[in-house]
Amino acid sequence: VYNFIDDNPGVLMMDVGYTNDPYVISQNDRFVAINSALQVDLTGQVCADSLGTKFWSGVGGQIDFVYGASLSKGGKAIIAMPSITNKGVSKICPTLLDGAGVVTTRNHIHWFVTEFGAVDLYGKTLQERARLLISIAHPSAQEELDRAAFERWGSHHHYIKGYMK
């Protein structure tokens, strides 16, 4: 690989300070950033590096690319993940686990995708975000998430399985 890259005019190597600069990323119109998550809460906060206090990876450039896509003319920031773990635990949760870090804030996410659909969270209220995320959660988790959303925000909103319909 190094021999291929060395003095190859077709390859441009740049420092991470440039490649991950949200301003540089945003100069690409319709830039789409697709990232993953370990867990997301009902407000759309994304944890991509730990489960609680147990670290799985470094933060990497997720927020840089999500922010760059958000600034890009016509850009989209997408988080895509399976709705449950291989042990059957929902990755969409009422709240992040204690000690979990928010890698990407709820305000930067446009689209969230699981195998059950895609929802646009951008500009939505917290209650709307909860309703939308519940709609793409694994069916086995929807009732618990619905209950948690109702307990958190009360009866003013309509959720999927409906404690208030």
Regions found by a protein language model. Give the residues of each.
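Conserved phosphate- and dinucleotide-binding cores of soluble alpha/beta proteins
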Residues: 1-165
